[in-house]
Amino acid sequence: MTTAPIDNIRNFSIVAHIDHGKSTLADRLIQITGGMTDREMAGKEQVLDSMDIERERGITIKAQTVRLNYHAKDGKDYIFNLMDTPGHVDFAYEVSRSLAACEGSLLVVDASQGVEAQTLANVYHALDAGHEIVPVLNKVDLPAAEPEMIKQQIEDVIGLDASDAVMISAKTGFGVPEVLEAIVTRLPPPKGDRTASLKALLVDSWYDVYLGVVVLVRVVDGVMKKGQRIRMMGTNAAYDLERVGYFTPKMTAVDELGPGEIGFITAAIKEVADTRVGDTITDDRKPITEMLPGFKPAIPVVFCGLFPVDADDFETLRAAMGKLRLNDASFSFEMETSAALGFGFRCGFLGLLHLEIIQERLSREFDLDLIATAPSVIYKMKLNDGSEIEIHNPVDMPDVVRIQEIDEPWIEATILTPDEYLGSVLKLCQDRRGNQKELTYVGARAMVKYDLPLNEVVFDFYDRLKSVSKGYASFDYHLTDYKPADLVKMQILVNAEPVDALSMLVHRTRAEGRGRAMVEKMKELIPPHMFVIPIQAAIGGKIIARETVRALRKDVTAKCYGGDVTRKRKLLEKQKEGKKKLRQFGKVDIPQEAFIAALKVDS
């Protein structure tokens, strides 16, 4: 393949909400430009989504790239570098880095659904990156498609001129050649100096069994060659380049990558954690002094405990997590023990979808049955002695008398919903301690902005939002800041013993409702024992809710036919003594489903 002059390179990404046809459009572009033959494409959809879970859920998790050759109508040959970015809020940082590697974006909007919350968030990311944006209306062949209305919506909501939007159906291929021409004529070429010192952006990285860590890079200035010694400026580690190349989508090795090009490098790097997304790569012999802007390490936001249902699976779980960590540096874990659940891990995630995906991959790829404890966030606590601590596990919370103030993280949520569900959506946000910031109407849809505590969102907010809006509302959020909160640690006691896996930090106003719902659920699922079992929810020494599991009754007087009443009484007293002793020393077996159900209750 020839290296084209920099003016003939176009780097672009496709921005879209989940399910609006982003990966399908990418498939068509690859097919038309001959990136893969029709035979290779046959029976294969979403070529760039390599994980099964990406295909099934119809989402893109890792950023992927493909280089395409295109012979345009003006008679020139162009090189297109297409970045397929994640569309979900949890991976917003990966999106921002992928966008930083490009100069333009195709904004794909479903002509039957319109603009969704995540479309908005990603368009703003693209505008922040200084992108030229070409609107593309997909699925125009559907009976429910309303292209003219959606064009107006794009102008009203995003403020983009959509009068010359490209009309396509990615599924059938209709209109896709016009998209290719629009990329040539409407998107700008990259800028870069071939003679300058090497400066490249680390876009993404993943682990390959044979090659070690494969790093996706965008060269800004200079040249990357095989055998060159490079330095990562964020970690200050140096490596010798072993392979340089690009994806077509197959891995293709070349001698060098020049300015404006996107490709991959391998350099015997052992761990993905050594390659931080957004880092700057330079030449070890002629280093540059300034890093590319926008680099920040991935910080976990949501935490939860993962425990194997079968204690024998602990080592398998440890190995499985190690393997996932090879490919996902933003996933962190440390060992923890729980009196109720045994050995497990405390894990950190970028957000709720990230947590779900990791859990699903553990159960699917490694065949593990897991129990997840209640998700929690990072709380900042100011203590009376003037020190500050951060905790994400309710078990680690210091004694209440030592705490001066607890601060919790807040988010700004953008929710788009059809107006008939607006009342239910507003009620849900109010119930979750939200403060409404703004409400605007776009046609028959409302856009609401709310400030919400992250603590209230991580639990089941997304599921509840989908159910109150019949699945039509879409939701996007970003962290804003920490605010003081009246939070208390609620414990669940079974037979007067605290169950550590069920402790959680809740707002004082919601503690009673939450506690009551949990103990009622536990009562249904804990089987009767030979003695009475009290199930209580407590804050400190105060019991706020209680349910009782009645004892099994064995008829000890069945053998007495007639005779004195004292005979019966003696047997009953003996049974009572035995039950008292049992209650003192007897162990209550809490079934796994009781844990799972208690953590899923809705207060």
Curated annotation (Swiss-Prot):
Residues 7-191 form the tr-type G domain. It holds the Pfam family GTP_EFTU. It catalyses: GTP + H2O = GDP + phosphate + H(+). The keyword Magnesium does not apply. It is a peripheral membrane protein. The lineage of its organism: Bacteria, Pseudomonadati, Pseudomonadota, Alphaproteobacteria, Hyphomicrobiales. GTP binds at residues 19-24, 138-141. It is an enzyme of class 3 (hydrolase). It comes from the Bacteria. PANTHER family: TRANSLATION FACTOR GUF1 HOMOLOG, CHLOROPLASTIC, TRANSLATION FACTOR GUF1-RELATED. GO terms for molecular function: GTP binding; GTPase activity; guanosine tetraphosphate binding; ribosome binding; translation elongation factor activity. Belongs to the TRAFAC class translation factor GTPase superfamily. Classic translation factor GTPase family. LepA subfamily. One of its GO terms (biological process) is positive regulation of translation. GO terms for cellular component: plasma membrane. Keywords: Cell inner membrane, Cell membrane, GTP-binding, Hydrolase, Membrane, Nucleotide-binding, Protein biosynthesis. This is Elongation factor 4. The gene is lepA. It is found in: Cell inner membrane. It comes from Rhodopseudomonas palustris (strain BisA53).
